[in-house]
Structure formats: C-alpha cells, structure tokens
Amino acid sequence: MPLVEQKKLALDGDVNAKLISWKVPANGFDKSHPVTLRGLLSMTAGIGVPGFLGYGVDAPLPNLTQILYGVPPANSPPVTVITQPGSAYAYSGGSYEIAEALMVDTAQAQFPDLMERLVLKPAGVSNSTFAQPLPSSARARP
C-alpha cells in the first residue's frame, strides 16, 4: 500500500493505464469493468490462473513477463480475465502476478528490492527476501 499512499497507484484505476511491461489482454469487460488494483488484491478482478505448480531446483525460472504471457520456461497458462471483474470472489495467483508487474512498472525497480524497501525493512524483518533464485546467503544455516 505504500505506492497507493504515495499516490503512485490508485486502488480503483484501470491497471492497464500504469502497466508498461505487459497489459491485461483485451476481454469483453474492458470498458465497463476494468481490472483494478482493488480487484486484484481482493481476488474479485476476474483473473484466471488460480495457482502455480512451481519449479524444480535446477529448472530454469521464468521472469514475470513470461509467467504473465504463459510462455516457456513458465509452466502455467497465460494470465487472462475469465469473468467480469467485480462480479465474484475467486482466488487467483495470477492476480498477484499482475499486482507485482504493476508495482515494478510504476516504481521502475525490481520486485525483491521494492519488497525489501517497502515491506520488510519497515516491518523490521532482516532475514527474509523475495529474491529468486534464493541467494546462498539466505539458505538454511546449521
């Protein structure tokens, strides 16, 4: 929420107005029911892709754009609108991927750095990271 508090993002604006690296694909609801940050965070944005399978230790990791488009090495389908935004609750991991892209595009910073600056440090959390792959300094210690 810091980016909303700083007025860099709006909870109720069309996310496509701020997305740069990827756009929510055209769908039958674009004009009258846009996808919003509020909808993404409350799981009412009508976004598909409920979850992600994950990747093996030595498997290549996709970047965020590959995940959103559903292209290799991503192992999930493209993130799309499947129901009218605002019409129903449906958990969607894809919603959080869009929220991540929105933050990264708006702040022009990498997600792990943003989370460190906006969430972890203010909360006093020092032994956690959002970096992938996990840095060796953050791996289990004896």
Enumerate the language-model features and the residues they cover.
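Short, glycine/proline-biased beta-turn/loop segments that scaffold the active-site neighborhood
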Residues: A10-G28, P122-A123
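Short, surface-exposed loop or secondary-structure junction motifs
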Residues: N27-P142
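Short, flexible coil/linker elements and helix-boundary hinge sites characteristic
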Residues: K7-K8, K23, Y69-P72
